[in-house]
């Protein structure tokens, strides 16, 4: 069993929508609702904690009225950074040994990914899902290529990411004490010297970040319904 944490206080500036991108629609339904419905199917998910911008609480509560989910969803105050939101949410976790942290803007997560991440977290204490990098990666400085990076060992990391609760708390507290800001929760665990297991993600498991992603998401949903 696990508790799901969704940091949902971000502004989504790259989307340029003027509002939280989680409220944007895919096939007439808000992105966050698609995501919640995906986890609703997972029996191992005990409850859901969403770290939100307090000003948006009425909008989230209205969504839950319009699109109810059976699992318990708790809204808590998010932080200035995604990392702060996850840390705040951890303070409300109880009764489970593991948490999964997931981007609310990844609505195409599958039950297999959830289970694989949880299993790997039980084995290693921390886990991520990832896919091989397909494009050539180059390091660029001041507009000039300085290195072509060997991509055979590179992975594009996704969510969900799974953790034992004590380990993730330790990693967050250490980062907080050192004013360290990581790019994801797994990077905080790496920082304290712990292993992070890796399981297979999916190229369908996109994070809806730009207007182009919305079009791709609509296409994915259309394919799923066929």
Swiss-Prot record:
Pfam families: IspD. Keywords: Isoprene biosynthesis, Nucleotidyltransferase, Transferase. One of its GO terms (molecular function) is 2-C-methyl-D-erythritol 4-phosphate cytidylyltransferase activity. GO terms for biological process: isopentenyl diphosphate biosynthetic process, methylerythritol 4-phosphate pathway. The record marks 151, 207 as: Positions MEP for the nucleophilic attack. The record marks 14, 21 as: Transition state stabilizer. Its EC number is 2.7.7.60. Catalyzes the formation of 4-diphosphocytidyl-2-C-methyl-D-erythritol from CTP and 2-C-methyl-D-erythritol 4-phosphate (MEP). This is 2-C-methyl-D-erythritol 4-phosphate cytidylyltransferase. It comes from Bacillus mycoides (strain KBAB4). The lineage of its organism: Bacteria, Bacillati, Bacillota, Bacilli, Bacillales. The gene is ispD.
